[in-house]
Amino acid sequence: MRGRLSIFENKINKFLRQKQDIMKNESFNLLIYNNMRNKQFIPLFLFFLFAASAVYGQFPGGRATFNFLSSPSSARLTGLGGTQISVSDSDINLVGSNPAVLNQNMTGKLGLNHFFLPGNIQSGNAAYAFTIADNKTWLHLGLHFIQYGEMPRTDEYFQTNGTFKANENRMSVGVAHSIDDRLQIGSTLSFAQSSLGEFVSSALVLDAGLFYTDSSKLTTIGIVYRNAGLQLNPYFSGNSKEPLPNDIQIAISKKLRYLPFRFTLLYNHLNRWNVRYYNPDNESARLIIGEELAEPAQIAIFVDNLFRHIILNGELIVGANENFKLRMAYNHRSRMEFGTVGVGGLNGFSFGFGLKIKRFSFDFGRSIYHLGGGLTHIGITTQLKKNIF
């Protein structure tokens, strides 16, 4: 039966599944907030993160199922390198990366986004938020879908036997609470389902995050543990359950005092150090050149691996009401994994813009993955005149 899905697996692995290597746990330092009213929360959150890191480290190779959970949920996030966990404004779509950034300015907002993927694969997101208690606790609802379309059904001998359809969906409900004017916490609980023809799998997913703002309101810090949870049932009866694509991220954003610009430094995959992988293209280069290529120095390997954890992005903000935004980001891991040996290009870079007209916001994002092209994301967000709930 596995052979029936061979074409589908080749298709989605190329675009939605990043190659991963053996993992190592890494300790890390989190922010310390001395003036926090609830001082018991930080130790509990630290314990939660480290415990999750230890559990995830048990899965050899770091391979996971439900990798669509890691895809960017909005055009703005695509333009900022795929994620943004340390910014909180009026954009409801930001809760897709960190549920703790939900705030009063997002209530009553409805966000709709569509992602154009290769092979006519279509993906979309919807998000909505509202207040539930004293303007300090907010709830958000979300829906994420991917339609892979109709594909040939083949057996292990690559003989075509009809067609099948495949899709993946995620339904979410999340909550955020403001402890005081500088610290917020939040979490999102999701039910995810994946259907590959007659083979169906489901999962329960949890995101948990922190968001901190300094006294100047110019520096913000975000910490999030994404895609914790478990696979409820595997695709094939009797098979062992697979891990989800867990990712612990920390980021700091700085808005310049005298210039309308904000930059962000994000470090992802805190729960494993080695994110490099064996690249067979290097072997092809050896064959073409006809001689052995020198192995990279250990310091070069260390630096390359370090920068694969990092995403850099910037956002130029124009207008007193932030009516226009230009965005650009660089993801070194994407550049190295999707690049062609000996050939340059813009893979790893992404860009986009946002335009606000009255109560409507329009966003465009494009991420360059390969010389052959990139992925385009568009979105619209509006303030509803009357709350749904």
What are these model-predicted stretches?
Residues 58-389:
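Subset of outer-membrane beta-barrel
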Residues 1-61, 314, 374:
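Bacterial Sec-dependent N-terminal signal peptides
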